[in-house]
Amino acid sequence: MLDNVDAALESAISSHEAGDLLVAGEKYLEILKSDPSHPDANHNFGLLCSKLGEPAMGVQFLRTAIETNPTVAGFWISIIDTLIEIKDVENAKIALEKAKEVGHDDEVFEKLAANIELLRSSKTESETA
């Protein structure tokens, strides 16, 4: 059990930013063992999974971050970007709609919508080719 989750998160983020990804991952997991729904640890670990080539695994952590705190626009941006990365058009569209429902509807989300549409169009073209 962690005595100071904030200090542990700060340490994990420092390792992450320094490029020490394995240490950062271990620190995020330590936080998540103590508090499985910690939104920032889930978000950052989800991003780390994606960076390490496991974006599909990262999605589950990004979802937990959003479920815990849907008001953070960055969480929505991260999951939509990751879903686009793994070419999951349907879930990216669903996430975008949910983000809009909770009030996230600025220019970044318009660009994400355009990226989803571009991916949908390219998938349709490749399926008909």
Regions from the language model: what does each represent?
Residues L2-D6, S11-E30, K51-T64, I86-K98, ...:
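Structural signature of tandem alpha-helical TPR/SEL1-like repeats
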Residues A41, F75, V108-F109:
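TPR alpha-solenoid repeat register
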Residues S34, T68, E101-V102:
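Structural marker of alpha-solenoid helical repeat scaffolds
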Residues D81-V108, A114:
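TPR/TPR-like (Sel1-like) alpha-helical repeat modules
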Residues L48, T82, N115-K123:
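TPR/TPR-like alpha-solenoid repeats
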Residues N44, S78, K111-N115:
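Canonical tetratricopeptide repeat
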